[in-house]
């Protein structure tokens, strides 16, 4: 176990050192966290490990980088901290950082780029003619960009960068190959189509870029400037330089530097000779170079091709090394993952072992305490058992002595009990003879009590019947008095209403006479002054219409009073029927209660003798109940017959009620006296009828007191103001005109509809 932990610790130390030198900041922090977790686990299990041991093994420069890596940057400045850490390294000073938004291709895309570039090697070299007139500063800037890309090139190889640079400069020549590829969308994205041949632009000849600059090339003056720069002297030793940079500097051939200078000189020379066919298409028309320029271009192109072959071979070798290193890195990462899983499992097992040991120690302590408690309990129970045995022996001894004494005393007690039982038997025989004599006397008394109870029940029945008759007579007297009072009130109200109607009729007749006289006076000068009589005619017409409307209002009010009176009568009859039914039910209940068997003090003696009398009383009570039901039904039948007699005499909705309603009240009173025979009185009905009769008088007074205009009345049947026929016309049709006739018809229809609605409402209430 200890050996495995040591081996995993050494592997982690090596990984951390390599990551501090060649890796990025996030992976370094991850490995440091893993190491600290492993050290904590080892220190918790064994207690011998020290977290400061791996820090002592590291190199000074690694510990310095570790201190910078473990420092926590402020929030929102993560990128700034990373760039500060990278700027302190000498290699990153030589390699400027790329833009943050630069998109890096994957390994598969780089491999496809290299294959595509190898297929394009056989064609003519297109970079000679595409020179940028800007000169060497553009090439140095591209070299700086290539070195900046080398900082992020842990996964990308040199062939990827070469292919990207060559495609950026030669993308205009082969657009069809790029756009036709569906497998590499990044190639098709970065390409732009060339301009049409023979179509000159207003800006003159199109500037082209310099030949491809490879990231492994570093010019002499740039190298010297980077070394002589005072910013780089502090950390310019080979110890701080990256291994790949040292290899690339060693692999730069000495011949390549003057050739680069020659290429920069070619950018400043005019093109005197004709370029090759594939370059002539890209150059503008009318531009030609001298023969010396063509020869130098050919020689430089051949040397450049030879250098490209060497670079490609080196690129293939580096690619193989990269793949091998990548496989080793994957295997190492897999081993590290396994080691981490093993460490976590070991830590989990150690924690489980500790928990088991703690649980076992607790269990042992608990078992020990329970054993001690059980031993003490057993000792206590043994002592208690010993005491119980002693007490049982003493109790057995006392019980044996007591049984002997009890046997001696029981024999004496048996002799005494036998003597007492003989005496009690003699007394029992004597009591039986006395009981037989008493039973005979009790039977005689029971017969006398039955006779007395029969006489008492007969007397009570006669008294109850007399009381019932007395109550009925009193109720009849009270009803008659209340009906007489109600009748007097109704008669007074009717007389008052007749007087009011008579006064109203006389007043209306006087107004009618006055109106006819006015009409005659207005009709005599009608031929001479037609223009002056028009407002008088309109005033007469309006006054006549006002009278008609007031007459209709009076007729409707009279109908309303008639229907109110009829509703009160019907309500009184219905209330009388309900009171009759309630009275019959109450009488039936009182009869049952009074004739029910009542317990008496001597009922325990004569229960067997009074069964026949009780049956007879029950039969009588049932007969009385049936008689009360028959009376109730007779009352309902009489009410229905009276209502059926009143139905044929109903007045039509358009006609008015008769003036005198006294005979109808007498008929209702006579029917009530016939139906109330044998029933109890209803105080609520009499009070309601008296109250409604008293309320009708103030309702009729405003009708007569209100100021009314003159009305034209018709011939009445019984001397009252109400009539059945239609009203006579007060003026001719020539005076009324068409508009007044239409208004009168509409008013009549409205009044008729109101009367019908009111009659329907009354019928619903009934």
UniProtKB/Swiss-Prot annotation:
GO terms for cellular component: bicellular tight junction; cell junction; cell projection; cytoplasm; cytoplasmic vesicle; plasma membrane; podosome; recycling endosome. Monoubiquitinated at Lys-341 and Lys-402 by Crumbs complex-bound WWP1. De-ubiquitinated at Lys-341 and Lys-402 by USP9X; the interaction may be promoted by cell contact inhibition. Deubiquitination of AMOTL2 negatively regulates Hippo signaling activation. Phosphorylation at Tyr-107 is necessary for efficient binding to SRC and synergistically functioning with SRC to activate the downstream MAPK pathway. The modification Phosphotyrosine is found at residue 107. Residues 64-103, 121-144, 171-213, 262-302, 516-537, 676-743 are annotated as: Disordered. Residues 221-301 are annotated as: Required for interaction with CDH1. Residues 64-79, 176-193, 291-302 have a biased composition (Polar residues). There is a cross-link at residues 341, 402 (Glycyl lysine isopeptide (Lys-Gly) (interchain with G-Cter in ubiquitin)). Its main location: other. GO terms for biological process: actin cytoskeleton organization; angiogenesis; endothelial cell morphogenesis; establishment of cell polarity involved in ameboidal cell migration; hippo signaling; negative regulation of transcription by RNA polymerase II; positive regulation of protein localization; regulation of cell migration. A motif (PDZ-binding) lies at residues 763-766. The record marks 214 as: Required for interaction with YAP1 and ubiquitination at K-341 and K-402. Keywords: Cell junction, Cell projection, Coiled coil, Cytoplasm, Endosome, Isopeptide bond, Phosphoprotein, Ubl conjugation, Wnt signaling pathway. The modification Phosphoserine is found at residues 746, 749. The record marks 107 as: Required for interaction with MAGI1 and ACTB. Residues 303-575 form a coiled coil. The keyword Protein transport does not apply. InterPro entries: Angiomotin, Angiomotin-like, Angiomotin_C. It comes from the Eukaryota. The keyword Ubl conjugation applies. It is found in: Recycling endosome; Cytoplasm; Cell projection, Podosome; Cell junction. Pfam families: Angiomotin_C. Regulates the translocation of phosphorylated SRC to peripheral cell-matrix adhesion sites. Required for proper architecture of actin filaments. Plays a role in coupling actin fibers to cell junctions in endothelial cells and is therefore required for correct endothelial cell morphology via facilitating transcellular transmission of mechanical force resulting in endothelial cell elongation. Required for the anchoring of radial actin fibers to CDH1 junction complexes at the cell membrane which facilitates organization of radial actin fiber structure and cellular response to contractile forces. Belongs to the angiomotin family. Part of a complex composed of AMOTL2, MAGI1 and CDH5, within the complex AMOTL2 acts as a scaffold protein for the interaction of MAGI1 with CDH5. The complex is required for coupling actin fibers to cell junctions in endothelial cells. Within the complex AMOTL2 (via its N-terminus) interacts with CDH5. Interacts (via N-terminus) with MAGI1. Interacts (via N-terminus) with ACTB; the interaction facilitates binding of cell junction complexes to actin fibers in endothelial cells. Interacts with CDH1; the interaction may facilitate binding of radial actin fibers to cell junction complexes. This is Angiomotin-like protein 2. It comes from Bos taurus. The lineage of its organism: Eukaryota, Metazoa, Chordata, Craniata, Vertebrata.
